[in-house]
């Protein structure tokens, strides 16, 4: 796709994850002292933002499909900037919760809309999705770092209003870059004809509809199970490292650095997966990723110290590597007119799973220990492998009907 537009979309993915996580750092480093509340008491106020982040994905996708995706991205940059500035004016935890809910509404725009713009077809769509995914991961990684610096140098309110102003400026630049598309109906997408199934080579469109339905069920099933794996590993890794790397270090900062190292290296697995998606298609790539997850989840059971660190890096390569695959398949199959809505459904499913995973981790760890968590994750990887076996070698598209 056009380079300048792709850069804006990548920056948007960075900012989307960045804004959602500012409060977590501000609460930990500053607000506990200013408002005399514990971290555990403050964190529930962030739930309003996360609920809006998931809940409003569907209407955001619907608006993008009905109006203009470029227009919705302009709304994203301006809206998330203004509401983040609003957070900086809060004088109580309740006011922060209200403003974070507003931030979540605008944050919900990015995934269904940005991915629908990137996944327009073309020979390098897999790589484009993968690169965009890395930008999102960097937003997660840098949120705590940049927020901490701003809190130390200026104060917690600056951690919200400075990025907010920056986002508004980026939104203005985006408007001038995309103004010819912002107020018009969707343009026709690029279609990579080499990857499509020719209708003349199929018995009839009824068979293709059935195939699309079957593949869609696999996509949404693996989306849910992959979300268990991704959330289960990324959320639990800090505590897992505290228990399993005690022979290496007991320093919280060193353990945090090791976790950041694993996440940073593993996130670039998306680039490799993206390139493979463009070359050999999603089925083989998904099977490889599922096998990597299954093998290293099982190997992690009972392991400690340096061996545990190495195995953790390997299964995180699988956890991050799976991220572009379902997005790639949706981009290949979904018709342009409703692609943003399909991506919205995908992220609503992921969000619903995330809500369940955190209590699951707590229950399993409290009653059985982390070894049993990895048995569960291995079963998840095996179920993905079995589901992916049923996929066709070439994906059907709605254009074939």
Region roles according to the model:
Residues 132-182:
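Helix-loop-helix hairpin linking two adjacent transmembrane segments in secondary transporters
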Residues 277-329:
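C-terminal transmembrane helical hairpin of 12-TM major facilitator-type secondary transporters
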Residues 55-93, 277-280:
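Conserved MFS/SLC helix-loop-helix module at the cytosolic interface between two early adjacent transmembrane helices
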Residues 333-368:
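A late C-terminal transmembrane helix in Major Facilitator Superfamily
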Residues 21, 50-58, 140-141, 263-271, ...:
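Residue-level signature of mid-helix packing/kink "hotspots" within the transmembrane helices
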Residues 23-25, 214-267:
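Extracytoplasmic gate region of multi-pass secondary transporters
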Residues 31-32, 63-64, 146-154, 241-242, ...:
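Interfacial helix-cap and linker-helix signal at transmembrane-aqueous boundaries
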Residues 99-138:
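Cytoplasmic helix-loop-helix junction between adjacent transmembrane helices
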